[in-house]
Amino acid sequence: LVKGGAAGAGVATLATLAGCSDSDKAEIEKLQQQLASANNKISGLENSVADAEAKASEAAAVVPQKKEMVIVSTWPRDFPGLGVSAQRLAARITELSEGRLTTQYFAAGERVGAFDSFDEVASGNAQAYIAADYYWKGKHPGFAFFTTVPFGMTTVEWNAWIKFMGGQELWDEISGEYGLKALPCGATGTQMMGWFNKEIESADDLKGLKMRIPGLAGDVMAKLGASPVSLPGGQIYENLVSGAIDATEWVGPYNDYFMKFYEAAKYYYYPGFHEPGGGLSFGMNASWWGTLSNWEKAVVEAACMEEHAAQYEEAQAKNGEYLAKLINEHGVELRQLPEEIFESFGKATAEVYEETRAHSPLAKKITDHFMAALREVGGWQGIAEVAFSNHRNRILDIV
């Protein structure tokens, strides 16, 4: 029986019913009923198939498509601390998204040079960079506040500013002017002043010193007569060994150990005035960020938040161990900077902040907001954690 058969059969049957016996008529009517019933079932099946096809089409339309995410970094591949952290973050995004965001990670120099990563992402050639935003101070000095600045915030204080005191909104504003969206993705805590091939006993010893030191701290050193240089991590060692620079800051004992600076500089100075904390940046192309669903954005934010905490915690766990290695295994001389030199650092820093404020309305807005938040959160830290730590270390003879 085929659909339509009932109608055709009905016409033919009507023409012959008059000549049929009662039993034949009954049989014909029975067949007509069966044919009509079959036709109804076929129609029902067709409707069910159509409904199933429509639902399948709707389901296919809402299945998220996989997105490729090219990430460029300013750190060397497999470099302990910073480099490994960046690779871990890239892998974590893919893992948390269950493969919907597939990352391709390129370390410094593998796709573009370290300092070219900003333009690579802003142009849309890559989707994200992992870097320290103070590298982009030449584009706008306000970027420095979203890594770290002289006499600025510790990582704990900076986190509070970014998350709960309006810092992220300012970061969005300055990044947005360059087609970017940035999130915190790492931190190393308070840094050492750095590695020097001569002793530093006063501010006069900084005059003529060629030092790798980026960000606003470089401007401070310039005011004290030094010659600041901004170099990506992968180029520092060769410049220190060759004598092209006399000193360098980097991070802290854990990260510095693997750079082997001890082969070219004998003195390891602390404390650093230049990088008290802050964080690193996962800078994304803003247009690409806008194409992500809320779920995909949440995945990226969660991965960045996780790595931001992990990198900081790893540094705190390992700095003491690797400081001992530097001293005991490589004969590094740990030196404390004289108190007087901080007065010179402070005066020069105040001048740099004023120059930064004068750069533009946005630079003034960021600087003023940062300093107001610093006074508030820093004041509390002084009463609480700093005061406690000083007494604890004295009582327990920790330092």
Regions found by a protein language model. Name each.
Residues 33-35, 151:
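Generic low-complexity segments that are intrinsically disordered, proline-rich and/or Lys/Arg-biased
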